[in-house]
Amino acid sequence: MKIGILSQFPQLYSTQRLVEACQSRGHEAVVINTLNCYMNINSIKPSIHYEGTELVGFDAIIPRIHASVTFYGCAVVRQFEMMGVYAANDSISIARSRDKLRALQLLSRKGIGMPVTGFANKPNDIPDLINMVGGAPLVIKLLEGTQGIGVVLAETKTAAESVIEAFLGLKANILVQEYIKESNGSDIRCFVVGDKVIASMKRQGPEGDFRSNLHLGGCGEVVKITAVERKMAIAAVKAMGLVVAGVDILRSNRGPLILEVNSAPGIEGIEQTTGISVTEPIVEYIEKMVSARKTNRPIIA
């Protein structure tokens, strides 16, 4: 097969590991900078051009769309889909998961546990908004934030009101979320491919920081997840319509809670922490799906 890896960062560990996994299974891997693609949108033969050449002959793509280019990245993935190319994560699912509010509403609709979350537009909604999620301490998140950036812990009601007023004053869209104190600044990252959790690790934030993102200095360790956590992670991925995803889970006094579903999860941290390859299962899944499409067999994930 000819597999395209959509990534702005060809030298990144995640990109290189995906290339290696494709090649080790006998496939041609082509790294494509998403932003350098341009599209011919028509009703007869839609196409994508790249650096002066039309992209042809691809069987599948693995989208690694950075959050900052979600709109254009999804347009490129959608164009590949129009050309009959299989996308490991399709454009609609990526867009769903990137919209934090919509993602939480989808989880809520499916009855999947998550922290109590509030969303508001007007400053005079603030006092009731804070009470709605259980009062301070609480977490305030920018809807557009990634990798722990734009996430603030407000220890008191006064601090919460000040931060919310400041964000809303800047016309920023925010979520207000209950703080799960018993998680102690840690979460569990599950790497899901299809209907399987391939690997999982516990991420612990640096001392004094409630955010556990490895990009912010957190550390990872191998963890054994429960059957409930495994089932919940898979259900969360299915709720988004994704195939490959990282699911972040908080352990709370009322059971596991889904914090986020990431459509382009980091690969380096979880592979180096667990010693498990997560890239080969991605390629194996693509092989199964492309083969089933060609033979019109029922697809069993």
From Swiss-Prot:
Protein family membership: Belongs to the RimK family.
GN (gene name): rimK2
Binding site for Mg(2+) 1: D248, E260
Binding site for Mn(2+) 1: D248, E260
GO terms under cellular component: cytoplasm
Record's protein name: Probable alpha-L-glutamate ligase 2
Binding-site list for Mg(2+) 2: E260, N262
UniProt keyword terms in alphabetical order: ATP-binding, Ligase, Magnesium, Manganese, Metal-binding, Nucleotide-binding, Protein biosynthesis
Domain ATP-grasp positions: 104-287
